[in-house]
């Protein structure tokens, strides 16, 4: 029975899923806009938003938790120094998912995942 089991498998092992979402979260925090498939985008929200919530309170313990989940010192620095302060007054909803059509090869639904209130200087072409 699958009672209370949430989340998508995405045809991957649990280790592959964990590594994939860790890499996607790091890319999202680095570029603030990424393009991926719609199911991956919806699952990424469950990984990335708690990290931003964690970054709103700067402590050594929270930094260690964030490093454990991202494995990137640069991203931990950006989370706590930039993103945590940017979203200090926002109670959740840090990501925006925008549908952007279908992929040419396999017709998979695609989506942009971006951080809300990000600087406007970034371009959509950089996400591709």
Curated annotation (Swiss-Prot):
MF GO annotations: structural constituent of ribosome
InterPro entries membership: Ribosomal_bL17, Ribosomal_bL17_CS, Ribosomal_bL17_sf
Keywords for this protein: Ribonucleoprotein, Ribosomal protein
Keyword Kinase included in the entry's annotation: no
Gene Ontology BP terms: translation
The keyword Ribosomal protein appears for this protein: yes
Signal peptide: none
Gene3D superfamilies: Ribosomal protein L17
Domain of life the protein comes from: Bacteria
GO cellular component, one term: cytosolic large ribosomal subunit
NCBIfam families on file: L17
PANTHER family with a match to the protein in the record: LARGE RIBOSOMAL SUBUNIT PROTEIN BL17M (PTHR14413:SF16), RIBOSOMAL PROTEIN L17 (PTHR14413)
Assembly and interaction partners: Part of the 50S ribosomal subunit. Contacts protein L32.
Family indicated by similarity: Belongs to the bacterial ribosomal protein bL17 family.
Name recorded for this polypeptide: Large ribosomal subunit protein bL17
Species of the source: Ectopseudomonas mendocina (strain ymp) (Pseudomonas mendocina)
Protein encoded by which gene: rplQ
């Amino acid at each position: 029975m699958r009672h209370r089991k949430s989340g998508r498998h995405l045809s991957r092992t649990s280790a592959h899923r964990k590594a994939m979402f860790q890499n996607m979260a790091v890319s999202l925090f680095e570029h603030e806009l990424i393009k991926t498939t719609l199911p991956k985008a919806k699952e990424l929200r469950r990984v990335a938003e708690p990290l931003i919530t964690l970054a709103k309170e700067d402590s050594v313990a929270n930094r260690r938790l964030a490093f454990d989940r991202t494995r990137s010192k640069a991203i931990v620095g950006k989370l706590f120094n930039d993103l945590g302060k940017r979203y200090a007054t926002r109670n959740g909803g840090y990501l925006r998912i925008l549908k952007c059509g279908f992929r040419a090869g396999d017709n998979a639904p695609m989506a942009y995942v971006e951080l809300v209130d990000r600087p406007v200087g970034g371009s959509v072409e950089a996400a591709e």
